[in-house]
Amino acid sequence: MGSAEPISAIATFENVSLADQTCLHGEDCDKLRKNFEECLKLKGVPEDNLGIALGLCLYSCATIGTSNKVNVQPTSTFIKASFGGGKELYLTHGELNSFLGSQKLLEGKPNKLRCFCRTFQKDYISLRKEYRGKLPPIARANRHGLPAEDHYLAADFISTSTELTDLQQSRLLLARENATHTEFSSESPVTSLKQLGRGLGTGR
């Protein structure tokens, strides 16, 4: 039996696609990005605005939620944005769902929208960093015990990531705990900013 190729021989992991039900990786991620950018261009988004258009779509998903239980009318507005020079993006929920349903890369995924958003989580975080303070707050951030500066962590598709600081990741984990907290739990939910971001190594 021949020896396996050392992992150091892999120049980059960007071209590695892994079996994952929650998001796409490597070449699959690149293909999905290209397909969605083509969709955006057909909708009138200029080439140099494709990045921010994707980010805004992800932010719209964050505010609405990506649960399969979310019920919205197919004809209702998903996103509307102007890019100057008469260029405007207008996309309905039905059009977004049609795009997701047409992607073979998403076949078999239990939640296509959430998989799509998690695939481009880095773009979502980058948008927040670039336009910090300009984006409308996500309403459920308060309910989850998140401070205003990190309201974007209330997105139900975001996961722990190297793009987030340890403090932000600890806040994210506490917010998830609060989101699943029930009235029958014996533990009290976070109720003050002092309880937030105490580090990942806490006993709570």
Curated annotation (Swiss-Prot):
One Pfam short name = Closter_coat
Q: Carries keyword GTP-binding?
A: no
Could you tell me where the Polar residues compositional bias lies? 183-194
What superkingdom heads the lineage? Viruses
What is the annotated localization of this protein?
Answer: Virion
Assigned GO CC terms:
helical viral capsid
What residue spans carry the region label Disordered? 183-204
GO-annotated biological processes: transport of virus in host, cell to cell
Q: Which UniProt keywords apply?
A: Capsid protein, Helical capsid protein, Transport, Viral movement protein, Virion
The task this protein performs is described as: Component that constitutes the body part of the virion. Also acts as a movement protein that is involved in local cell-cell movement via plamodesmata. At least five viral proteins, CP, CPm, p6, p64 and Hsp70h are essential for cell-cell movement.
Similarity section:
Belongs to the closteroviridae capsid protein family.
Name listed for the protein in its UniProt record: Capsid protein
Species per Swiss-Prot/TrEMBL record: Beet yellows virus (isolate Ukraine)
